[in-house]
UniProtKB/Swiss-Prot annotation:
Family note: Belongs to the UPF0178 family.
One Pfam family here: DUF188
Taxonomic lineage of the native organism: Bacteria, Bacillati, Bacillota, Bacilli, Bacillales
HAMAP family associated with the record: UPF0178
Protein name: UPF0178 protein BCAH820_3075
Length: 146
């Protein structure tokens, strides 16, 4: 198993790095050049930089990921592609994407886009909380223990 993180705006990178390093599982953070950092990463953690274009990180993750790798993303499109490839896919708020829930998530995203396109406003996501982080940590630990 390898772990790939859609790292632009991912609020749980610290949890992923800490828990994966402890378990000696390699982590690849995929992020745009606009988030470039000279920060030293622990052994087993790699950062790949991609262009800032739409979906560039998603495409790179899909090139790299293999069946049974673990992907962390908030992007439903990437989650859908990764599930089809046989990957385990987690959202940073602590839930697992499945073949059963991805259809509804994609449909909701589409309907919200149609509402916005018609000039109306839609609600954004709720703020990320400490409870969300702990929920993610518990799920992540259970997934890497498999």
């Amino acid at each position: 198993m390898k772990i790939y993180v859609d790292a632009d705006a991912c609020p749980v990178k610290d949890v992923i790095i800490f828990e994966a390093t402890k378990a000696e599982i390699p982590v690849t953070l995929v992020t745009s050049f606009s988030h470039y950092s000279n920060a030293e990463q622990p052994k087993g953690v790699e950062t790949i930089y991609v262009d800032s274009g739409a979906d560039a990180a998603d495409y790179r993750i899909m090139q790299l990921a293999q069946k049974e790798d673990l992907i962390v993303t908030q992007d439903y499109g990437l989650a859908s592609l990764a599930l089809a490839k046989g990957c385990i896919v987690l959202h940073h708020k602590g839930y697992k994407y499945t073949n059963e829930n991805i259809e509804q998530l994609l449909q909701t995203r589409y309907l919200s886009a149609m509402v916005r396109k018609s000039g109306k406003r839609t609600k954004g996501p709720k703020p990320f909380t400490a409870e969300d982080k702990e929920k993610f940590r518990a799920l992540f630990k259970s997934m890497i223990a498999l």
